[in-house]
Amino acid sequence: MKTNEQAYEDLLFERDEIDSRILRLSNFIDDVHNISKLSLHQKILISIQLQAMKTYKEILTARAADIAIYSSKNSK
């Protein structure tokens, strides 16, 4: 079973990985000079993927904060 500290570190690592993916996707969007040539379907999929990753990052951040609060309460 993971300790709170291990779970916290795992969440932060996963959050950083998601942040990296968000940055890569954002850069891809910026680098595509002919974004207007993408189909509406492709634009919608990219938008959904980007929003899903941002939401997941927020969830990971909240879970990490919960663990930090729980750990600090139990260490007193």
Where are these regions (language model features)?
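Extended, charge-rich alpha-helical interface modules
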Residues: 1-76
